[in-house]
């Protein structure tokens, strides 16, 4: 009864309390990130990763067709890795995912990057000793590529004819598969970072 009397007797207090609740709610809403802004940020990051993969594949084509460096089976495997990573990033960019979907895409991208890095590590192992050339010619990977006829899908990019053990090109003392390993590690790290960047206010 006293509360009812106070509410009717002192309406200014009731208005002040309502205003306080309103401003408190506005402050909480402002503190929360806009889902649309987060989705835009994630989409831009995935787009950047897709463009990086396109650039790496374009550089591979340059080395092959302008520098006459024929790819080997393990080169093609790594190119397939870049294609897979790029497709995951592209789908993620077009989807404009929420928090859960962002984690899913980043997990898939990390797995694809890890697989590509493993292929690059094995290629570096083959190049470390020319005597390991026999492990490339007629290897299970070469037979799988032949059975799947991967070269017929994108012939300028996925056909191979070169040996695995030669080091015909280097930049800053790193060979092609060593640079490939560096880029796969960077791409994997970027996929790991995307969900955390998306949470940033």
Language model: regions and residue ranges:
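Short terminal hydrophobic/aromatic SLiMs and anchors at protein ends
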Residues: 5, 15, 22-23
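Short, Lys/Arg-rich, polar N-terminal cytosolic tail immediately upstream
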Residues: 25-39
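Interfacial segments of alpha-helical transmembrane regions
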Residues: 39-49, 97-119
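C-terminal TM-helix exit segments that contain a strictly Trp-centered aromatic cap at the helix terminus
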Residues: 59-64, 115-130
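Non-cytosolic membrane-interface motifs at loop->transmembrane helix junctions
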Residues: 69-79, 105, 137
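Structural signal for the C-terminal ends of transmembrane alpha-helices
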Residues: 90-98, 192-199
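Extracytosolic (periplasmic/ER-lumenal) interhelical loops and adjacent juxtamembrane/interface segments
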Residues: 129-172
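A hydrophobic membrane-anchoring alpha-helix module
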Residues: 156-201
């Amino acid at each position: 009864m006293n509360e009812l009397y106070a509410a009717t007797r002192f309406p200014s207090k009731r208005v002040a309390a309502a205003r306080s609740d309103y401003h408190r709610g506005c402050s909480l809403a402002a503190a929360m990130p806009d889902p649309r802004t987060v989705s835009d940020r994630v989409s831009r990051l995935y787009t950047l990763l897709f463009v990086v993969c396109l650039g790496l594949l374009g550089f591979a084509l340059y080395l092959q067709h302008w520098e006459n460096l024929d790819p080997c089976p393990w080169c093609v495997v790594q190119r397939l890795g870049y294609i897979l990573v790029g497709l995951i990033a592209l789908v993620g960019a077009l989807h404009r995912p929420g928090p859960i979907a962002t984690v899913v895409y980043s997990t898939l991208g990390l797995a694809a990057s890890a697989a590509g890095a493993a292929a690059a590590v094995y290629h570096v192992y083959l190049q470390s000793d020319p005597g390991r050339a026999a492990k490339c010619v007629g290897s299970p990977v070469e037979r799988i590529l032949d059975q799947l006829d991967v070269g017929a899908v994108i012939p300028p990019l996925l056909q191979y004819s070169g040996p695995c053990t030669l080091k015909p090109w280097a930049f800053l003392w790193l060979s092609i598969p060593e640079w490939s390993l560096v880029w796969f590690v960077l791409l994997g790290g970027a996929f790991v970072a995307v969900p955390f960047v998306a949470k940033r206010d």
